[in-house]
Amino acid sequence: MDVLKITGGIPLKGQVKAAGAKNAMTKLLVASLLSDKKCTFYNVPNIGDVEVTVSLCQEIGMEVRWDRAAGIMEVITKELKTSYIPQRFSGSNRIPILMIGALLGRTDQDIIVPTAGGCPIGQRPVDFHIQALEQLGAVIEYRGMKREGAYFAHAHNGLKGTLITLPYPSVGATENTILAGITARGVTVIKNAAIEPEIVELILFLQKLGAIITIDVDRTIRIQGTRRFYEVEHTVIPDRIEAASWGMAAISSKGKVFVEGAQHLNMITFLNKLREVGGGFDVRSNGIEFFYDGPLQGGLHLETDVHPGFMTDWQQPFVVLLTQSSGTSVVHETVYENRFGYTDTLKEMGADITPFRQCLGGKSCRFASQSFSHSAIIKGATPLVGKEIRIPDLRAGFAYIMAALIANDTSTISGLPFIQRGYENFIGKLADLGANVSLVEEEKNVKEMPENSSKLPLFAELQVN
């Protein structure tokens, strides 16, 4: 498998464009399965998770035309070929479980969905999904199969709207409940719902599709069921995770990068924390410029939370930033229980990070009585040294890229498909920003990145009709 070599110490400088949001586009594809109308998407990210989701949707009957260069995709699902999701998708991402909510109103057949996958960052149970769907009238059973297992679901008596209070504002459970509520009879009310920008994006798309749906400031979503749908054109919001990632990479490398498409509204909490450590940024009409504005100051307490709190996917690269900040900082992860495994590699590179099982620096969270390392103390600033790194998951992957960019000497990074799941053309963008990067193929030939690498492919082309 190919590996990436990065020689650190070069400030990133230039401009990149934030691609369409992974966590929006993948869910919009699933939502389009609710109807038999054509949906046209713009600003579609050319990333691995969209590839997998397209392949999954095609498996059950979606027709797809994807102009990757233009970022335009047309989809239509005139009829379902099957309601069985093959087990090869079980470890791909978290999308398969959302098929239950989307397909319950589209078929009378059993919907068979393999065990959920995604990044190995915690247990990420789907109990909240199942409980909410059952309240709407779905019958769901888990059965062991040859390799893993699958959920069997149906709504032979139809779905009926009701009041659902989620135990925790889970993004996935909120999405699944919304999708099922669209075709349920009557009104569905979801309390304690997630209100992430990607949830709002889903709601905007569904309203265009024909839904009558509202969202209130108290985390309440109301849906009037319908089966009357329309053709839709929709532009996907820029990815706030990618935008923040490039911003942190710019500042930690003592550089200056303008991120086209970065949206101020969806990054308020992140920008506040960035300013607290001394990171510079300039909000413009078409994006945000991030720049090194002098030595970074730690002494920060950071707690991840559901929106509008500090996003859990910003946590790993921000920890790398804190390793370059003077003083002692505390990070408390409250969304996923097992998201500090990546720090072992950072410590081997020279970082001073100590994970703890206790809730440090703030409120107690739902992991307080469990034996998970979900807090960390980071002491900086510490120099980092290059090493061989194996990427374990998507967001830790970018944290390792950041660490390699600021490390002394050269790092060799494997597991690149994890980053390709969520970052469009990240190697080309690194090269365009001046990073010293080279891709080493299996036969050990080295490909130096040309000056203008913005068109370099990330992965093998998926055949999409």
From Swiss-Prot:
EC top class named in words: transferase
CDD domains registered for this protein in UniProt: UdpNAET
Residues where 2-(S-cysteinyl)pyruvic acid O-phosphothioketal is found: C119
EC number of this enzyme: 2.5.1.7
InterPro entries: Enolpyruvate_Tfrase_dom, Enolpyruvate_Tfrase_sf, MurA_subfamily, RNA3'P_cycl/enolpyr_Trfase_a/b, UDP_GlcNAc_COvinyl_MurA
Pfam families cross-referenced by the UniProt entry: EPSP_synthase
GO BP, one annotated term: cell division
Primary localization class, coarse: cytoplasm
Molecular function per GO: UDP-N-acetylglucosamine 1-carboxyvinyltransferase activity
Binding site for UDP-N-acetyl-alpha-D-glucosamine: R94, D313, V335
Catalytic residues identified in the record: C119 (proton donor)
Chemical reaction(s) catalysed: phosphoenolpyruvate + UDP-N-acetyl-alpha-D-glucosamine = UDP-N-acetyl-3-O-(1-carboxyvinyl)-alpha-D-glucosamine + phosphate
Keywords for this protein: Cell cycle, Cell division, Cell shape, Cell wall biogenesis/degradation, Cytoplasm, Peptidoglycan synthesis, Pyruvate, Transferase
Domain of life: Bacteria
Cellular component terms per the entry's GO annotation: cytoplasm
Pathway the protein takes part in: Cell wall biogenesis; peptidoglycan biosynthesis
Protein residues bound to phosphoenolpyruvate: K22, N23
Subcellular locations according to the entry: Cytoplasm
Family assignment from sequence similarity: Belongs to the EPSP synthase family. MurA subfamily.
Alphabetized HAMAP family for the sequence: MurA
Function: Cell wall formation. Adds enolpyruvyl to UDP-N-acetylglucosamine.
Name of the featured protein: UDP-N-acetylglucosamine 1-carboxyvinyltransferase
